[in-house]
């Protein structure tokens, strides 16, 4: 990813750093409108997810997470920006005339060919079942349920690793550090998701953040006591507690939020590390 730095004529351009190569030119038959209802609110209009709201209107790009065009070679025609995710997407022209979007694998360029199936080369961008992959393969866009499409390791720069195969299950290590079991018949895509340097971008100003639909984040220590447990005091005061707390009074550090008795509890061999 090429980071473009502007001439320092204003504070926003002095501090901004954006990608200068990838543009957005979506195909009309692969996009459709979406109604972004709520934006962090529930049916009563109450804020349930803070720091969300506003943002530019978006058109949803239909992404092929299933990769079910078996044994049909496709060619990467364009690499485009997608406002609905931090990873880039590729437009694929298949040999039978069909056109689809997929997640952009790291290192893939325009003109590369990809294919999905059971006996395909272990090559970046190819999709195949876990049972046909050698141990140690770097993968992304991993299925949890057979035929449902990839659900894991889809963010920019995400990569998982196939570390074991035993019986009907395969063991993979996810980007979060979690180690879990998945059916060997589920498919995944070889390689790492592109746009690895997304965290190197600097928006440079608050307005660019608002375009993304992200509202300002205010520290609890500068709020009033009615708004946050850290609030109150004369001038710059400490939080007044032994440990930090959330706006609702729960411990902010170390409290587990995962639901108990979840169906996947027996499939997780090691919980994610922070």
UniProtKB/Swiss-Prot annotation:
Keywords assigned: Chloroplast, Plastid, Ribonucleoprotein, Ribosomal protein
Cellular location(s): Plastid, Chloroplast
Listed PROSITE patterns: RIBOSOMAL_L2
Record-linked SUPFAM superfamilies: Nucleic acid-binding proteins, Translation proteins SH3-like domain
Region (Disordered): 1-25, 224-274
Family annotation (SMART domains): Ribosomal_L2, Ribosomal_L2_C
An example molecular function term from Gene Ontology annotations: transferase activity
A single Gene Ontology CC term: mitochondrial large ribosomal subunit
Quaternary structure and interacting proteins, as annotated: Part of the 50S ribosomal subunit.
Similarity-based family: Belongs to the universal ribosomal protein uL2 family.
NCBIfam families assigned to the protein according to its UniProt record, in alphabetical order: rplB_bact (TIGR01171)
The protein's name in its UniProt record: Large ribosomal subunit protein uL2cz/uL2cy
Organism of this sequence: Aethionema cordifolium
Gene transcribed to yield this protein: rpl2-A
């Amino acid at each position: 990813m090429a980071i473009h730095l502007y001439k320092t004529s204003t504070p926003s351009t002095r501090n901004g750093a954006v990608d200068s190569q990838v543009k957005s030119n979506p195909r009309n038959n692969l996009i459709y409108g979406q109604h972004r209802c709520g934006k962090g609110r529930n049916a009563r209009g109450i804020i349930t997810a803070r720091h969300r709201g506003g943002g530019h209107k978006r058109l949803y790009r239909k992404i092929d997470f299933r990769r079910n065009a078996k044994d049909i070679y496709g060619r990467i025609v364009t690499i485009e920006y997608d406002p609905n995710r931090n990873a880039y997407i590729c437009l694929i022209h298949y040999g039978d005339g069909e056109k689809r979007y997929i997640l952009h694998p790291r290192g893939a360029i325009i003109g590369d060919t990809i294919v999905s199936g059971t006996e395909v080369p272990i090559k970046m961008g190819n999709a195949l079942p876990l049972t046909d992959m050698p141990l140690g393969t770097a993968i992304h866009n991993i299925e949890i349920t057979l035929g449902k499409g990839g659900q894991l390791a889809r963010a920019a720069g995400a990569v998982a690793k196939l570390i074991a195969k035993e019986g009907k299950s395969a063991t993979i290590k996810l980007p979060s550090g979690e180690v879990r079991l998945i059916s060997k018949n589920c498919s995944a895509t070889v390689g790492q998701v592109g746009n690895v340097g997304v965290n190197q971008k600097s928006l440079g100003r608050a307005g660019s953040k608002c375009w993304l639909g992200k509202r300002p984040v205010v520290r609890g220590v500068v709020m009033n006591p009615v708004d946050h447990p850290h609030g109150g005091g004369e001038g710059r005061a400490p939080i007044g507690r032994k440990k930090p707390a959330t706006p609702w009074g729960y411990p902010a550090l170390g409290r587990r939020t995962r639901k108990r008795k979840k169906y996947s509890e027996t499939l997780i061999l090691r919980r994610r590390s922070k």
